[in-house]
Amino acid sequence: MLLPKGAIFAAMLTLTIGSTAAQDARPVDQGQALVNMYCADCHATQATGESPLAIAPRFGDLHLLYDVSFLSEALVEGIVTAHPDMPQFEFDPEQAAAIVAYLKSLEPKE
């Protein structure tokens, strides 16, 4: 069966767009898994909700405190805070980028 060139092009375009969307979602999903694994004991890791530890900021509010784009370097070098309850974490650059992608996904859409 022969398909018109337009149908082949449309099918290829659909596959490309679908593949790109899946690749874009992957870092956000990875970041969400990482924060749920390492941060959820103390922080609300969703856009809303209360943190289990009162002094731990909700991740949905981090953009109000920091430009989350700059957190990637701190996540790789190790975040150290003034309060002793927070453990020091060090992530590899891919993990840090995924966490930042997830945090950005929590910011309100303008």
Where do the protein language model's features map onto the residues?
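N-terminal hydrophobic targeting signals that begin at the initiator methionine
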Residues: 1-3
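Bacterial N-terminal signal peptides
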Residues: 5-18
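Gly/Gly-Pro-rich "capping" loops immediately C-terminal to redox-active cysteine motifs
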Residues: 28-32, 47-76
